[in-house]
Amino acid sequence: MQVSVETTQGLGRRLSITVPADTIKQAIKKELINAAKSVRIDGFRKGHVPMNIVEQRYGASVRQDVLGDAMQRSFVDAIIKEKINPAGAPNYVPGEYKEGEDFTFAVEFEVYPEVELKGLDGIEVEKPVVEVNDADVDTMLDTLRKQQATWKETDRAAQAEDRVTVDFSGSIDGEEFEGGKASDFVLAMGQGRMIPGFEEGLVGHKAGEEFTIDVNFPEDYHAENLKGKAAKFAIVLKKVEERELPELTEEFIKRFGVADGSTEGLRAEVRKNMERELKGAVRNRIKTQAIDGLVSANEIDVPAALIDGEVDVLRRQAAQRFGGNEKQALELPRELFEEQAKRRVVVGLLLGEVISTNDLKADEDRVKTLIEEMASAYEDPSEVVEFYSKNKELMNNMRNVALEEQAVEALLAKAKVTEKATTFSELMNQTQQA
């Protein structure tokens, strides 16, 4: 077998492979003999069909199968011989086959980039230093009460966290625009659902009032024709409702799994959940900074085949989230996912090199700890731990999580890490915006 390697462009490679004529001849002969043992042709007993008839009837398809198999086998042998690491599926370009002559074909593919890590000592990471205090617990309890609140109609003027029912009609330069009109629109204020200035314009008005508010669409608004535009909204305020918070009664507290229904028990349970959430947020904040620094310091070429594969993964995940099927997933625009897909591939390649360079293996004690931490959020943690231990795929997924954490720790060992005091709410807001 003869092999030549050509670099086409960037990570692209083209192998030209020649398979000796005798190798093809013997393979075709072997397959025809095997076929002759099982074919049925009228006038002949099974296994006694003359070889010339077998070849006449099945020769073309056998040759096609043999050539396809020869290309695949020869490609594998060639990349092993040339020490090439292909990325993605290869594209076979068959040559013309002539009986008695060597068979030459080409294979086009991409290779993984050679990654040489640099700039690790220049990575800067701020480690959040924060504790859950009593005020944080109070705030969370207020949030829980708000989530369980009821609404009561009031005749006073609307306030910042009321719920209102309105009719509105938006216009720009006197012309109404698409999507700018609604009737009996129910809005729980204070959640940032509307553009800046809209909710503020409702505050101070009572049910039954009709008025106009002036707003400006943000420069980064999703609708291109509205970005940065000044608009007027004609408002009819139909109803104002105020939130009625439930008291921390024994019955209310037991809804959250606190068996004794005590305020102290609820506070302890809330604090435990907040501390678990905080631990994960700190971990993710540090990890994000370390990986961002790694990516910034190491610009690498990325095989298009890997990006294509990751785009398909993201498409399917998006379709599943919204109840779509395989066909609908593939119809989602590629540009929605391409940037994220490329970053995921880059991060995977760079972290893979960190793991390889540091000869890292998943720490089973860490894997166990990660599973226990995750299970602690469920009603029966031991049942979740047992479920994981019996599921090979889930265990391997958790080993990958542990290995990624170990790779991040290897980065942090060389990075410039400084501590920064912050609060629970600040850190959680940063996490939600990331």
UniProtKB/Swiss-Prot annotation:
SUPFAM superfamilies according to UniProt: FKBP-like, Triger factor/SurA peptide-binding domain-like, Trigger factor ribosome-binding domain
Enzyme Commission number(s) from the entry: 5.2.1.8
Entry's Gene Ontology BP terms: 'de novo' cotranslational protein folding; cell division; chaperone-mediated protein folding; protein transport; protein unfolding
Domain PPIase FKBP-type: 161-246
MF annotations from Gene Ontology: peptidyl-prolyl cis-trans isomerase activity; protein folding chaperone; ribosome binding
Family: Belongs to the FKBP-type PPIase family. Tig subfamily.
Entry remark concerning the domains of this protein: Consists of 3 domains; the N-terminus binds the ribosome, the middle domain has PPIase activity, while the C-terminus has intrinsic chaperone activity on its own.
Listed NCBIfam families: tig (TIGR00115)
Protein name: Trigger factor
Species whose genome carries this gene: Serratia proteamaculans (strain 568)
Name of the gene encoding the protein in the UniProt record: tig
